[in-house]
């Protein structure tokens, strides 16, 4: 009888935990889905203004991430939600908000998350007109990070900045280095690698 009572007490707790887990995983999954769809639309129109549909999806990404942060602050996906939200804010030109969120990762994130946060902070500074600071930070990340995907992102952004500054040799150098890092990173199948590869192809055929 005692065991039955214990079982009856445990079942509601287990169900509640399962529902809680499903809720925040589902919310974050939807945030990722909106972000990936926004990125797909943006990359299809590369070189032009970001389409309204993509901007709308980036906005929905931010909304979903905020739900994760406010309703599930103890979940293991909090850092991922902060990073995803900051990336969406970058594409919506909300650079100060993105930088503010990325600073949270510096003290709470893993080494990989910190490197990614540093990357997005650097490109936010570039878009804010702090080009030299962005150049220095991107180069520092390349030196300090062991992550080939992060290094590829840095090189491709350095290529974009070099192109903007009219530095043809630097543009080609960083494009080639970005391609090398992507080749190393091909072992990791991810949406990030796919989008970076597409970005590289478009820059190389400009």
Predicted regions and their residues:
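Bacterial N-terminal signal peptides that target proteins for export
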Residues: 1-12
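Acidic, polar-rich low-complexity tracts and alpha-helical solenoid repeat scaffolds
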Residues: 17-206
């Amino acid at each position: 009888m005692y065991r039955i009572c214990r079982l009856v007490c445990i079942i509601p707790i287990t169900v509640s935990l399962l529902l809680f887990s499903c809720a925040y995983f589902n919310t974050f999954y939807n945030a990722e889905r909106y972000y990936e769809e926004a990125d797909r639309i943006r990359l299809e129109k590369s070189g032009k203004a970001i389409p309204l549909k993509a901007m709308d999806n980036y906005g929905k990404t931010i909304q979903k991430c905020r739900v994760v942060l406010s309703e599930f602050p103890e979940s293991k996906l909090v850092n991922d939600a902060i990073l995803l939200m900051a990336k969406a804010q970058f594409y919506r030109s909300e650079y100060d908000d993105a930088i503010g969120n990325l600073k949270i990762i510096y003290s709470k994130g893993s080494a990989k998350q910190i490197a990614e946060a540093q990357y997005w902070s650097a490109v936010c500074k570039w878009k804010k007109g702090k080009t030299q600071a962005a150049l220095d930070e991107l180069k520092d990340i390349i030196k300090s990070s062991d992550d080939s995907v992060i290094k590829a992102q840095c090189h491709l952004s350095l290529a974009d900045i070099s192109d903007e500054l009219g530095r043809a040799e630097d543009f080609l150098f960083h494009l080639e280095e970005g391609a090398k890092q992507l080749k190393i990173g091909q072992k990791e199948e991810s949406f990030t690698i796919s989008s970076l590869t597409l970005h590289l192809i478009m820059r190389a055929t400009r």
